[in-house]
């Protein structure tokens, strides 16, 4: 009901509303380790969840970058483990604050303290804090699910209690941090003692134990881990992790709790009392495997539901189109074990609540739609944005830093021959669009877009939308390129159909560096695609010729996770490079009929 004007009383006709959610679990996960959120900030997240009928708050309370929950038996976890010197994530945030003229990336001063001359960042929740937040959530119909991640992602604890790790093997492995040592009985006792205190603070029957991204190399070297493998008649370090997870589940059940784990634990032999959080979009078998084992599954594949990922024009559309039960391999009985959906917010590059708001609104509202409505009842994108208008008005009143819907009417690179017109639209009424053409950041004093702009030369635009309250959204940059049709080339004598694809064993973060990595295979592909044989560390270089049927301006979409580049006629046309989540850019070029050399690079 949208209230307008200053009238104080309203009449609502007598009606009967019949409505119910499609899924029982409608969740949101907040990472409090990489960056810390105080009590009021957590309550604010709970308020937003409550507005849109999300009812499960998954609280990530420990990780390598900080331990956030008081454990009375082990005081160093918060005395020392809750605080750190600025790390690469903090430095990246501070750099972005300056580069993008965006205070959302500044590190809050109330989470910084000076100890013996060192600047430390952090914070933690006392038992009383936890009880207060749990009560606040309960009043809003929200269950709180704590996560203490183990056996990996445990460096904040291991740094204070090094005896928890394999002897002499503390730090970082090839990808992830050193895990705990499951060969030590004392380590297992430590884990149980931590969870005993956690169980007492959180009344909900489920507790999350993590279980993801475990660096097992230390276990291969550790005599105690190898002894455990022999004693328990295990065959590998993978089975050692499975043994540890099963052992913890027994402890959970003995204490009246049920275990939830990330989808890496789906093959660990857990009981049907356990639940699985499916996060790896590429682990396609996790969902059918878990449901076949009669384990409840919380669906949150990163491609759709990692709200820390950068947003583009497709983000909301993808969420609305997603059906958690669409996997054709699932029987009707298996679909009954799909417990619901959840969005996850990892906070490496999110230091402020304003940045959280920007990343989750309106995506949280789209999540609520698919959690509540049957597929046939969901709105299409146009209708969804129409329904959002009053929601944005509510956000304005609440002073929520929501993301303004994408400006429409242009691509990342736009081609024209003689002259063209820039015509913009914004789906949200009441906004202002300011722009610059000199590379600077648009401000409230920059030129106001109030109608079509005539362009007769190559021009770089920076557009920024300002909400009705005057607060800015992110800057969008686009290039208009004036150029004649690019000439075609003469066909080589030995030209064959398809593209040549060279696969490199690449572990870097820039497409230009792929060539230096070892070659693992060469293929011919019919289109720009990843050959079926290519897995693991991927660096692909695809080369060939594009056959253009007629003179014209052609449009290319480049979608990748991580980086990609498109080079046409020797010119870098599409730059989607760097390590990032799924992002699409669209570019144009004026081409003459005939053959044009093309190169596409991609790494993951």
Q: Which ranges hold each PLM region?
A:
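Feature activates predominantly on carbohydrate-active enzymes
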Residues: 1-189, 194-206, 247, 251, ...
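Active-site beta-loop-alpha junctions enriched in small/polar residues
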Residues: 33, 62-66, 149-153, 212-214, ...
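Active-site neighborhood of glycoside hydrolase catalytic domains
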Residues: 157-163, 167-273, 280-292
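Flexible, acidic glycine-rich loops studded with aromatic residues
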Residues: 259-274, 280-421
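Short, compositionally stereotyped local motifs that mark structural "simplifiers"
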Residues: 379-502, 508-544, 553, 559, ...
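Short beta-strand-plus-loop segments that form exposed binding edges in beta-rich domains
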Residues: 599-604
